[in-house]
Amino acid sequence: MAKNTEIERKFLVKSDAFIAQATTSYEIMQGYLCKDPEKTIRVRIRDTRAFLTIKSSLLRDGIAKFEWEKEIDLSDAKELMKICLPGAISKTRYIIKVKGERLKVKGERTKDKGDSLKWEVDVFHGRLEGRVLAEIELSDEDEAFERPDWLGEEVTGQPQYYNANM
């Protein structure tokens, strides 16, 4: 898989049972400098760290997307947030790590038992209060994974669930 390729699947969350499984959580504030349907430029502040991220579906097929991310100075991020498009997002992100099984993925690779997969569950605040989404990042589009009981309907690829469109 190319270094700048991100493969994520996104789901609605039907209960708050994930909170008991979370190993950590942190606050995120993010805004967008560009929200073109095929590419986004995002500024994100996560606690005391900040990142500039470019995502695009132009160079990839399926659910894989190009992603480039660079850590930037917190002061620079705060200045960039001032020029972001309206509709900044505030959310709490919960991290849930789960053990992988011996799952076959495309080609000859396998994910050994003990390898961990990571769920990121976002609980939105402010104008998006009540929205809760979960994402899992995979190494291959065909990689299998166990679905937790708290997971709801899959919404991967549905534009209304892209953070940039909320």
What residue ranges belong to the model's regions?
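Phosphate-end processing signature that detects enzymes handling 5′-triphosphorylated RNA
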Residues: 1-166
